[in-house]
């Protein structure tokens, strides 16, 4: 399983191993409206997806095989309930070699897909949105923190997180 956002800091499943990994052909982007978990229908937030192009540093998990039937249905529902993602088996580069991992990539045909927005607009959206799992700001800042702690550098996300933590502009 490949994680690039909240799966890094909230995997919600048992795993036997976790490795840093690079996925080529997709990049981490705030490209999905969240109208439940990090926003509402009236005030949607933005959450991460793997959009086409570039590359993404994240982690791959080797799942605890005997426990997969216990937690995989909830994980599948978490990622696939809105139709926003497409499940794919893709090669992820680790220091130990390439491993095939289940990756949830952005479905650009989903009505929740967001193309590029100006950074100031992204900041404003994230600051005002909150949903079932809390403020959208917390989601973005926590993802940036978890990436740093895992040894993953995402300069654009770090800049965004600093702006969000600095208070109103």
Identify what each model region corresponds to.
Residues 1-169:
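A glycine-rich, hydrophobic/aromatic-adjacent loop/helix-cap motif
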């Amino acid at each position: 399983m490949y994680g690039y956002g909240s799966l890094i800091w909230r995997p919600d499943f048992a795993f036997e191993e976790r490795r840093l990994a690079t996925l080529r052909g997709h990049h981490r982007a705030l490209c999905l409206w969240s109208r439940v978990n990090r926003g509402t229908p009236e005030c949607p937030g933005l959450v991460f997806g793997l959009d086409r192009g570039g590359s993404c540093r994240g982690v791959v998990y080797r799942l605890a095989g005997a426990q997969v039937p216990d937690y995989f249905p909830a994980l599948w529902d978490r990622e696939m309930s809105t139709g926003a993602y497409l499940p794919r088996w893709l090669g992820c580069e680790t220091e130990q070699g390439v491993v095939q991992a289940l990756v949830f990539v952005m479905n650009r045909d989903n009505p929740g897909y967001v193309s590029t927005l100006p950074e100031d607009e992204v900041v404003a959206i994230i600051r005002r949105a909150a949903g079932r799992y809390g403020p959208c700001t917390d989601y973005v800042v926590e993802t940036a923190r978890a990436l740093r702690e895992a040894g993953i550098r995402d300069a654009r996300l770090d800049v965004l997180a600093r702006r969000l933590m600095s208070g109103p502009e």
